[in-house]
Amino acid sequence: WGARSWVCAGSNFAPEAHIALYEACVLEGDFKKGRAVMSAMLPLMRVLEQGGKFVQCIKFGLTLRGIDAGPPRKPLQPLNKDDKRELAEVIRTMNTAISSIKGANT
């Protein structure tokens, strides 16, 4: 993708994925592995960037990790059940894929 750096709010609730990307690209210089990790992260990026619920997704992602970030400030509303289920599934799928990528290269 060509970026030299990246700041992503998702790293607050999915640090392992972001660390895997850093390790692959920066520490190992394995850009094929890095692209695979980033590809596994793209569904999460889509959820975060589409639908106008970025803040709510970040807060719920933190909740899934046991970190209480409180409710979103008004006028924002918390995620509904379907949005929560979708985000949780995207994170689960991403984590499984990245574990597999890391396992295949160790």
Can you annotate each of these PLM segments?
Residues 1-49:
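Catalytic alpha/beta core domains of metabolic enzymes, predominantly
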Residues 23, 60, 89:
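Surface-exposed charge patches
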Residues 25-26, 63, 92:
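Short polybasic/polar patches that bind polyanions
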Residues 34, 58, 87:
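Conserved, mostly hydrophobic/aromatic
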Residues 40-76:
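Conserved short secondary-structure transition element at the edge of the structured enzyme core
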Residues 67-101:
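Flexible C-terminal active-site loop/helix
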Residues 104-106:
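Eukaryotic N-terminal low-complexity, Ser/Thr- and Lys/Arg-rich leader segments
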